[in-house]
């Protein structure tokens, strides 16, 4: 920064976008291999490459922001705009799944028996595990807000406690979702109901895992005193993302579990 006449961060060449793209290719190809040929080798390779990329990319960004001072107010403003645009793109991503669901359910075709849920499908009870999942995510939304307020007030211990509670609730949600999938009386191959249900709730579950990972990184960074009350965009971005995941779940619960059943 000492040799620059501007406040912007000129990023050094990095291999991580390339390895990240490679891991995405390996994971999507691996999913196809798993679905059609029952082989998980390519999927595991993709997941390993993805984990290594995440670790090293996060390490570089933490070095640049916390230790080298590259994240000036101007850079943070750009990162905020970037995160907002990313969340908007995610909203549009999930809109596609809701569109598919309502397109199929509002005017069910004769092939589905002219009714929704389709003939032969026994939907999950929305007042059992899905309602528990809803309360778990709403509670995690409260605890992440508590963590944010504690950080703003400089209360490190409360911030760590609240962040730990949020992570625990996120992991609990994932375990509940996995058990629900395991016990579901229908599969992803059971027509349009199975495919829209598992793709929409599955991608949301993936986002919960990503959000939990993001919060775990923030937890370890807070243990190392990386965040201050006026310089903590990494945590702020994780909190925004978590609230987004919360809101998407409410729409999923009302649409697919409650109305759709």
Curated annotation (Swiss-Prot):
Catalytic reaction(s) noted: 4 Fe(II)-[cytochrome c] + O2 + 8 H(+)(in) = 4 Fe(III)-[cytochrome c] + 2 H2O + 4 H(+)(out)
Key words, A-Z: Membrane, Mitochondrion, Mitochondrion inner membrane, Translocase, Transmembrane, Transmembrane helix
Signal sequence annotation: none
Major localisation: mitochondrion
SUPFAM superfamilies: Cytochrome c oxidase subunit III-like
EC assignment: 7.1.1.9
UniProt-listed Gene3D superfamilies: 1.10.287.70, Cytochrome c oxidase, subunit III, four-helix bundle
Topology versus the membrane: Multi-pass membrane protein
Any Gene Ontology CC annotation: respiratory chain complex IV
Class of the enzyme per the UniProt entry, highest EC level: translocase
InterPro entries (alphabetical): Cyt_c/ubiquinol_Oxase_su3, Cyt_c_oxase_su3_dom, Cyt_c_oxidase-like_su3, Cyt_c_oxidase_su3-like_sf, Cyt_c_oxidase_su3_a-hlx
GO MF terms, alphabetically ordered: cytochrome-c oxidase activity
Family in the record: Belongs to the cytochrome c oxidase subunit 3 family.
Self-association state and partner proteins as the record states: Component of the cytochrome c oxidase (complex IV, CIV), a multisubunit enzyme composed of 14 subunits. The complex is composed of a catalytic core of 3 subunits MT-CO1, MT-CO2 and MT-CO3, encoded in the mitochondrial DNA, and 11 supernumerary subunits COX4I, COX5A, COX5B, COX6A, COX6B, COX6C, COX7A, COX7B, COX7C, COX8 and NDUFA4, which are encoded in the nuclear genome.
PANTHER family membership: CYTOCHROME C OXIDASE SUBUNIT 3, CYTOCHROME C OXIDASE SUBUNIT III
Entry function: Component of the cytochrome c oxidase, the last enzyme in the mitochondrial electron transport chain which drives oxidative phosphorylation. The respiratory chain contains 3 multisubunit complexes succinate dehydrogenase (complex II, CII), ubiquinol-cytochrome c oxidoreductase (cytochrome b-c1 complex, complex III, CIII) and cytochrome c oxidase (complex IV, CIV), that cooperate to transfer electrons derived from NADH and succinate to molecular oxygen, creating an electrochemical gradient over the inner membrane that drives transmembrane transport and the ATP synthase.
Protein name (record): Cytochrome c oxidase subunit 3
Species for this entry: Pelea capreolus (Gray rhebok)
Gene: MT-CO3
